[in-house]
């Protein structure tokens, strides 16, 4: 009997250990982005669960989006984001991916837009470490290295592990783009390897501002204008500026920022017609300046007629115009956490 027990107990223990190992392996295979993000931010599985909770379907998708953006895989970002989800972080990454692929303006009204919060993540004393860690991505891609470095430093400081390859690698990249070889070597020594200097990093170098200026952290418009002045070919920064104006419903600022030779987009045509209608002029020169087509003008007249006939009731039959800037301009409101508009 004792001999049998000596055989059964080790066998049962081995079986239990095997089942446990298979459970954890299965979880890692089921949630690969969760565990990859843990490694990228210097967290073991226990710390990851403590600070970010257990892995689940929604967090796996969001972490996958963050990792794809960090690697510059914009097709994957667009594949993983969905217009059916009202999530500010998803909108932030979706907009950035569209800007990197040159289609921000054309896609803006087809996705959930929480006003300017879908373009930039503001950081204050209430911001979570996770959001802080993502806040610098847009500035890095647009070429605002001072803001990108500040965000990376904050992310490192507020990270639960106070380290992480993701943040150190980004700081190395920023200093490589800025041409600070001494700082690059410092981060390479900490990382223990040399980051890959890909062509996209050389392209970002052409976007960086040649002069710096004092500005408030939330003064996005001034910083975008500085980037555009430094490099007028920075199309992503220009689209971000124009889309910022439009999401804030600042039509006058949009017209001023658009200039005499702004880019062509159906979104910009729609916004221009609101301005032209409000100013009481639709001269052919102005229509040409904003690249307004006959179809856009015809649909604007139809939208205005339906809207005025219903005296502003949002239940009016305007479904076919739901993805236009006119609809956003008339009906979009920002609801805060306390329910106020």
Each model region followed by its residue ranges:
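Serine/threonine-rich low-complexity intrinsically disordered regions
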Residues: 2-4, 44, 57, 82, ...
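Ser/Thr/Asn(+Pro)-rich, low-complexity disordered segments
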Residues: 1, 23-42, 61, 65-73, ...
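Hydrophobic/aromatic interaction determinants used to assemble and anchor large protein complexes
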Residues: 1-56, 62-65, 95, 198, ...
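Soluble catalytic regions of membrane-associated enzymes that act on cell-envelope
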Residues: 47-213, 236-247
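Alpha-helical linker/edge segments of TPR/alpha-solenoid repeat scaffolds
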Residues: 99-121, 176-187, 195-224, 251, ...
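Polar low-complexity intrinsically disordered regions
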Residues: 12, 339-340
């Amino acid at each position: 009997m004792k001999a049998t027990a000596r055989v059964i107990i080790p066998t049962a223990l081995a079986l239990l250990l095997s089942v446990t190992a298979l459970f954890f392996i299965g979880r890692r295979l089921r949630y690969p982005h969760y565990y990859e993000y843990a490694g990228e931010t210097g967290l073991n599985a226990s710390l990851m669960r403590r600070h970010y909770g257990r892995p689940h379907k929604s967090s796996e998708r969001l972490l996958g989006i963050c990792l794809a953006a960090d690697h510059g895989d914009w097709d994957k970002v667009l594949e993983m984001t969905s217009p059916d989800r009202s999530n500010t972080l998803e909108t932030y990454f979706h907009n950035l991916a569209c800007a990197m692929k040159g289609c921000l303006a054309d896609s803006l009204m087809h996705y959930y837009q929480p006003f300017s919060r879908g373009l930039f993540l503001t950081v204050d004393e209430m911001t979570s470490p996770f959001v802080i860690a993502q806040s610098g991505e847009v500035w890095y891609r647009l070429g605002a290295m001072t803001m990108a470095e500040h965000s990376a430093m904050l992310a490192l400081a507020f990270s639960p592990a106070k380290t992480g390859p993701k943040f150190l690698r980004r700081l190395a990249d920023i200093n490589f783009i800025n041409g600070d070889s001494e700082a690059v070597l410092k981060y390479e020594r900490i990382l223990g390897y040399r980051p890959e200097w890909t062509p996209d990093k050389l392209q970002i170098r052409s976007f960086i501002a040649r002069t710096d200026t004092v500005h408030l952290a939330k003064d996005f418009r001034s910083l975008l204008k500085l980037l555009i002045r430094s490099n007028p070919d920075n199309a992503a920064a220009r689209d971000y500026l124009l889309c910022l104006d439009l999401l804030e419903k600042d039509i006058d600022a949009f017209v001023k920022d658009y200039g005499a030779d702004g880019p062509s987009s159906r979104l910009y045509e729609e916004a221009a017609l609101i301005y032209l209608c409000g100013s009481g002029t639709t001269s052919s020169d102005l229509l040409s300046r904003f690249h307004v087509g006959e179809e856009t003008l015809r649909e604007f007249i139809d939208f205005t007629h339906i809207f005025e006939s219903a005296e502003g009731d949002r239940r009016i039959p305007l479904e076919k115009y739901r993805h236009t800037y006119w609809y956003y301009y008339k009906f979009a409101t920002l609801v805060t956490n306390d329910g106020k508009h």
